[in-house]
């Protein structure tokens, strides 16, 4: 077992782990690492701790990423049943005994390992999706963005200034105060995402009150390829809840993605967030998969 602090993960190790993640995704039919943990591997400085298991030839066959209060693990399908997952879990808990383990796709092997080390299911993340019909009349993106929201709120796109970054982070922290990952985003986390190839400032929207100009909400869209879009982050200030901003922004997002030729939209939502799930179900989203987190009961 080898352990690496964030600052000493080399390019070769990162490449080997990402190759392992690709093999695991192919074997299991689900992404093996979340974006957050993948970025922590690719960008030293995002406060992660990395654990690696190699075979006698030096090939990476197991990996765990400890980031904040959570850990994600992956084991090469050809080496399952050899105790690799158990070794990684024990090593991760030695780093932080109260860690919670993500099981992407909530596969049986992950659930069995969690039970074996005394953990219980404590959280669910729902992956939802829907298809989009081609854009019809009125599908011009510029016109859609220029049109005020139903309550008169003004929508503008992100300009990339430091003031906007800090304003967005403050809104994000308020909107996701109870969310252990999203609500803890830092300026460095935001800027790493701004540097990703998929980032498009015209798809990060800031919604201001038409009266005092206060930042009320934000919609961040992600289009990783021409056919697929994602409602990446939808945040509404708690003081602006009940104004219909979430639904209005979701409708606007679907219209803009449709205008761009996207034919499939996906998103992730907390399983216990019944209000958000109802919003998305009303907008035509249906379950694709459920990711589970296991922790101390």
Swiss-Prot record:
Its keywords, alphabetically, are: Acyltransferase, Repeat, Transferase
Single annotated GO MF: mycothiol synthase activity
| Chain positions recorded as acetyl-CoA 1 binding sites | 73-75
The Enzyme Commission number assigned here is: 2.3.1.189
The chemistry this enzyme catalyses reads: 1D-myo-inositol 2-(L-cysteinylamino)-2-deoxy-alpha-D-glucopyranoside + acetyl-CoA = mycothiol + CoA + H(+)
- Could you tell me the superkingdom of the organism this chain comes from? Bacteria
Biological processes, Gene Ontology terms: mycothiol biosynthetic process
Q: Where does acetyl-CoA 2 bind?
A: 234-236, 241-247
Question: EC top class, in one word?
Answer: transferase
Pfam families recorded for this chain? Acetyltransf_1 (PF00583)
Q: Which residues form the signal peptide?
A: none
UniProt domain N-acetyltransferase: residue ranges: 155-297
The record's family statement is: Belongs to the acetyltransferase family. MshD subfamily.
Task: Tell me how this protein assembles.
Answer: Monomer.
Q: What is this protein called?
A: Mycothiol acetyltransferase
Which organism was this protein described from? Beutenbergia cavernae (strain ATCC BAA-8 / DSM 12333 / CCUG 43141 / JCM 11478 / NBRC 16432 / NCIMB 13614 / HKI 0122)
